[in-house]
């Protein structure tokens, strides 16, 4: 018998339930499914295995993806406003065009994920693994990358229209060519020395352009 979500009542875990607002699929296996254009607003999706599942153009507002498996999943074009992805595993996931304002990716493992054209304002990535992630044309403001591994990540053409915290972030060969970092906070000179910028890269006050950049010969 299908389970229905009733406002004000706690939904019981039901792995056979249809995608509905507030559904509880915690720790269910939902691999290789086509769930695009669904409505999971407020759903409990913690620990769910969504590997290679299509969640594109889906309402994920205020949903809980903590410790979920999102390997090679697609959330492209979805609305994940105020959602939690804490400790999620999303290697090579597609989050291009996602609206994730106010979301939390604290301690998430999102290596090689695609955040192109994403709205990442007020997003907390503290202690996340984002090596080789792509942030092409992403919108960043009040975004936190503190203690994040951003090695070889790409920030080309980002819209950084507010402060972005890079405190103790690892920026080994991070691509910041042409990026305006003048509003960034927490950056130190030794972090900049590891990154790949160019003569168009704008640094915060007090930091100097290195004599050379590691990726100049590429």
Regions found by a protein language model. Name each.
Residues 11-218:
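Tandem repeat scaffolds
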């Amino acid at each position: 018998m299908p389970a229905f979500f009733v406002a004000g009542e706690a939904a019981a875990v039901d792995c056979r339930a249809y995608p509905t607002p507030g559904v509880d699929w915690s720790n269910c296996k939902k691999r290789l499914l086509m769930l695009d254009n669904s409505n999971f607003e407020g759903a409990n999706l913690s620990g769910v295995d969504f590997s290679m599942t299509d969640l594109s153009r889906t309402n994920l507002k205020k949903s809980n993806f903590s410790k979920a498996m999102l390997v090679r999943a697609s959330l492209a074009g979805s609305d994940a406003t105020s959602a939690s992805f804490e400790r999620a595993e999303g290697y090579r996931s597609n989050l291009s065009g996602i609206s994730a304002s106010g979301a939390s990716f604290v301690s998430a493992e999102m290596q090689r994920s695609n955040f192109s054209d994403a709205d990442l304002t007020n997003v907390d990535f503290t202690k996340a693994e984002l090596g080789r992630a792509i942030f092409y044309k992403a919108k960043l403001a009040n975004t936190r990358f503190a203690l994040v591994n951003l090695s070889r990540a790409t920030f080309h053409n980002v819209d950084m229209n507010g402060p972005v915290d890079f405190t103790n972030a690892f920026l080994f060969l991070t691509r910041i060519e042409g990026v305006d970092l003048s509003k960034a906070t927490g950056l130190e000179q030794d972090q900049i020395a590891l990154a790949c910028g160019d003569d168009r890269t704008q640094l915060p006050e007090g930091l100097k352009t290195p004599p050379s950049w590691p990726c100049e010969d590429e």
